[in-house]
UniProtKB/Swiss-Prot annotation:
GO terms for molecular function: ATP binding; metal ion binding; threonine-tRNA ligase activity; tRNA binding. Residues 253-555 are annotated as: Catalytic. Belongs to the class-II aminoacyl-tRNA synthetase family. Binds 1 zinc ion per subunit. Its EC number is 6.1.1.3. This is Threonine--tRNA ligase. It comes from Chloroherpeton thalassium (strain ATCC 35110 / GB-78). PROSITE patterns: AA_TRNA_LIGASE_II (PS50862), TGS (PS51880). One of its GO terms (cellular component) is cytoplasm. It catalyses: tRNA(Thr) + L-threonine + ATP = L-threonyl-tRNA(Thr) + AMP + diphosphate + H(+). Its cofactor is Zn(2+).
Amino acid sequence: MSETLADSELIKLTLPNGDVRAYPKGVTGSEVAASIGKRLAEDALAIKFGGKLKDLAFPIQQDGAIEIVTFDSDEGKALYWHSSSHLMAQAIEELFPGTKFGAGPSIETGFYYDVASEHRFSEADLREIEARMLEISNRDLQIQREELSREAAIEYFKTRREDPFKVEILEDTLKDTPVVSIYHQGEFSDLCSGPHFSSTSKLKAVRLTSISGSFWRGDASRQQMQRIYGVSFPSEKLLKKHFSQIEEAKKRDHRKLGSELELFMISPEVGSGLPMWLPKGAILRNELESFLKDEQRRRGYLPVVTPHIGNIELYKTSGHYPYYSDSQFPPLTFTDELGKEEQYLLKPMNCPHHHQIYSSKPRSYRDLPIRLTEFGTVYRYEQSGELNGLIRVRGFTQDDSHIYCRQDQLVDEICKAIDLTQFVFKTLGFAEVQTRLSLRDPENTSKYSGNNEVWVQAEQDLKDAADKMQLNYFIGLGEASFYGPKIDFIVRDAIGRKWQLGTVQVDYVMPERFDLTYVGSDGQKHRPVVIHRAPFGSLERFIGILIENFAGNFPVWLSPVQVMVLPITDDFRDYAHSVLQKLLDAGIRAEIDERGEKVGKKIRDAEIKKIPYMFVVGEKEMAAASVAVRRHKEGDKGTMPLQEAIRLLQTDISTKKIS
């Protein structure tokens, strides 16, 4: 940039690595990206300035932090897929004139567009639309944003575009928005807040995956539409990798493996979304619970147990009742012997119950911090279409802890909670963990409880702790809970998928609502601060993710059956049973395969069941009080004395070895 510009004509932009560069006022995101590097300029999709996503053409007028958004980030993928939905709509309009367009968002797995057309779309149509999308990409159409009044936009979509769905959005959803935006690419225009990538040429590879029925705005009484799904990428290589990952994910599906490995079941007689744990699954679940309980005990947590239901007034006080009312089971209504009506809820959250335990007796500043913990089951009435094995259920168990502390203890306690969460993920083999600092949406503060001063303090506390722990976090505006900001931990599994798991949250709101106090050194009452903390989150969901991450090949310490004893023939059954008993006496979970099958068949079946170790016993092993050791997926490990083999197993178990 020119060095002759006066200081008043320059702005300072801070890059993610901390570098500060001077640019002329009005510099665009594209120009900033180009000044950093040619490759970055090619990959750039948008910018993030002042915490908000903007088009590359956005003119920057003031100092601030800037980030160049590429497809590598979650925000970049969402933007890329949203832009791709616009390209799909343009292709459909060119191929099937008269089609009207509803909503076309990005979703976690790509994008879709709801369309209204007399034409019934087929698989062959999808291939034709794909080809037209790539042809539009080759046109290199510039994608341009136009801002105009809501009234002008209504007129535009009534007369020039003749799209009743966009008119309805403008007259209803955006009725209080004076200025709206339209994006143009060639002859196609769409109502959208953006941002979008700068040219249709950014689309390099696309696959339209399916068609389903939908209703306008999700209302079955409204017009039926066709929903066309797709996914797109900046290269054909990434597209192929994506579908390869999908095939691998099918093999790892926890619902499939959960049935094959006899871990859990869901019975329609019991109810949708209510999993039942079979013996092997219960062992896996109990091992995870014991692991965390033991670690928490070492770190000063106190166990509590609370009921599965609570008086509705409890959740009105906490604010959970109005906040979760759409996803709760209906209240249970009872009339007592005096004719008084009472209502109870299946517990949607453990927090209010723990607050009652805290306030059950006077607390002193010397008592704090108090760390209460519970594996507490909670209930949410999820829609049937959203249920998914263990990942999305109606009854689930949270590893819920609430830490009550003084303000001067807060940052250290947050750090300790972060350390525990990191320890859990490391032990379970999640090596790649991202952290998101989930803050309020500054544009919509009305949906959060508590005053501004409290929120500013809570967000600063979390930032201080995250910095102290040297977390490489990113900011998630609008991702906070209604009663406090939080740190969310996002893990990447064995096939590259991201999952949001553990949470650490600061809460100044609930102590006020429940009038929680402690007596300070000055003899006066003070409010404690509450930290909500759950490394697993939902235990059911965590196990579902764990099953898929390990593809059912659990580390020895978690495996429901750790050793299968395989006698070569019936002649060695007695010795096999003595081996089994010694394993059981040593605290090792073992079974014996006494079927009259050849040992090769027994080995194959144990491999299918994903049992970590197999001890094969025959005449030679019996004579030497030894076992022939086989490792799942690794094969023969040689013959060794039984006691040595037991010590090997015990070491794997005690060290919680992953592989």
